């Protein structure tokens, strides 16, 4: 991970109020075990990277399965969910819709079944991928949970993305930085000197 230069040098011994930080993990796609390992190696709480439930993973899988078809949930109970797959075709100046199949998802095992073997295989592959991979949005939520549980994070702007962290949490920032570096992300850290009567001392 490349550490960006701070906007100004801070002399040794200068007291800091804290740091302004921002992070990016755009494009990151990391296997769940690798994310857990990165958290563990950085001395962070592994519990923030929970397993993804099959029902939530299937919602992600549907985004890739939904090309030229409409997928709708039609039934759900404690053990399973049932989805209707409807193919969409354009004919001249109108769209036509044809029922493809009803697909069942076992909410406990994560197994899917339907009467179209090819579609069942594709759906299972997409689901397994979604279960095993964490996206940039997932990593951002993990970082948010870490700070919620272990450090103070004050937003600089209403929409988030840039935060002030008090100096007492500098060591925690170090660990988050190490974790992000392991999975291809970056954190930018800008020191906020406490200053003196003569100026910042920076």
Please describe what each predicted stretch is:
Residues 2-106:
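Charge-rich interaction surfaces and accessory domains that mediate macromolecular binding and assembly
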Residues 95-173:
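Internal, hydrophobic cores of structured domains that mediate oligomerization or house catalytic pockets
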Residues 2-11, 21, 30-49, 57-62, ...:
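Terminal interaction module
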């Amino acid at each position: 991970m490349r550490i960006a230069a701070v906007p100004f040098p801070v002399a040794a011994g200068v007291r800091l109020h804290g740091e302004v930080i921002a992070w990016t993990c755009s494009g990151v796609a990391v296997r769940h075990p690798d994310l857990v390992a990165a958290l563990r190696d950085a001395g962070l709480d592994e519990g923030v990277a929970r397993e993804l439930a099959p029902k939530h993973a299937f919602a992600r899988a549907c985004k890739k399965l939904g090309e030229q078809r409409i997928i709708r949930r039609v039934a759900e109970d404690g053990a399973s969910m049932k989805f209707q797959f409807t193919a969409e075709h354009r004919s001249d100046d109108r769209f036509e819709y044809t029922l493809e199949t009803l697909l069942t998802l076992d909410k406990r095992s994560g197994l899917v079944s339907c009467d179209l073997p090819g579609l069942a295989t594709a759906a299972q592959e997409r689901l397994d991928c979604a279960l095993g991979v964490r996206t940039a949005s997932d990593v951002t939520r993990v970082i948010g949970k870490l700070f919620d549980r272990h450090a103070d994070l004050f937003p600089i702007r209403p929409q988030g993305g840039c935060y002030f962290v008090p100096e007492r949490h500098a060591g925690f920032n170090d660990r988050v930085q190490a974790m992000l570096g392991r999975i291809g992300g970056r954190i930018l850290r800008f020191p906020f000197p406490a200053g003196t009567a003569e100026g910042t001392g920076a």
